[in-house]
């Protein structure tokens, strides 16, 4: 009987222990389920974050691609602008060469004008010599006086025309000086523009430059190129005007030289007639 009681007590104790272990295992199972649910939630959150990061990465890559495209466009615009500046430099160089040629023609015209003035002085001296000669033949004297009056009128007219030519030459020289000053101003503007191009090029190489500022610099740069082109056109127009003025002046000088030649021929004719008259008077 005692053995049965002991056995029952042992079985009861074992039952209690089994129940305790079952409770413990159940609690552990609950805790494991809670941890599993928590882990699954963390996994879902992690997947969500990964998806968000992937989306953000796609957006960043798209923005980077767009920024690279805009940068390439800016670099192309910069290359085009540099090409325009190089073309402007070449045109300004050609304009300077035209100005130099115009100055050479102006110097030639000035030299010819001086020679024509000397010829006019010589004609005036000859006129005075002829005027001071005394003639015994009254009719011949009257004819010579009329011819001298005509020659004096032609000489005065030539002097007036030479004065007009000199005035036109002075105007052309002033126009050329102004054109040279504007050309020098254009060169200074080009130097400033090249410096600004260098700064713009350095700024465009950095992706940190905002699109708004880059567009503002591009618009300012285009405006400066437009202003420089307008100034270049104005300088070219002035150079063309100076060239036409020099050509017109050259024609005027040539015409005056022809008139001087004709006047000299008239003086020679008068001198020949005077010599013939003196010979005839001496023969009497």
Swiss-Prot record:
<keyword id="KW-0175">Coiled coil</keyword>
<feature type="compositionally biased region" description="Basic and acidic residues">
    <location>
        <begin position="12"/>
        <end position="39"/>
    </location>
</feature>
<feature type="coiled-coil region">
    <location>
        <begin position="1"/>
        <end position="284"/>
    </location>
</feature>
<comment type="similarity">
    <text>Belongs to the tropomyosin family.</text>
</comment>
<keyword id="KW-0020">Allergen</keyword>
<keyword id="KW-0677">Repeat</keyword>
<dbReference type="Pfam" id="PF00261">
    <property type="entry name" value="Tropomyosin"/>
</dbReference>
<feature type="region of interest" description="Disordered">
    <location>
        <begin position="1"/>
        <end position="39"/>
    </location>
</feature>
<comment type="function">
    <text>Tropomyosin, in association with the troponin complex, plays a central role in the calcium dependent regulation of muscle contraction.</text>
</comment>
<protein>
    <recommendedName>
        <fullName>Tropomyosin</fullName>
    </recommendedName>
</protein>
<comment type="subunit">
    <text>Homodimer.</text>
</comment>
<dbReference type="InterPro" id="IPR000533">
    <property type="entry name" value="Tropomyosin"/>
</dbReference>
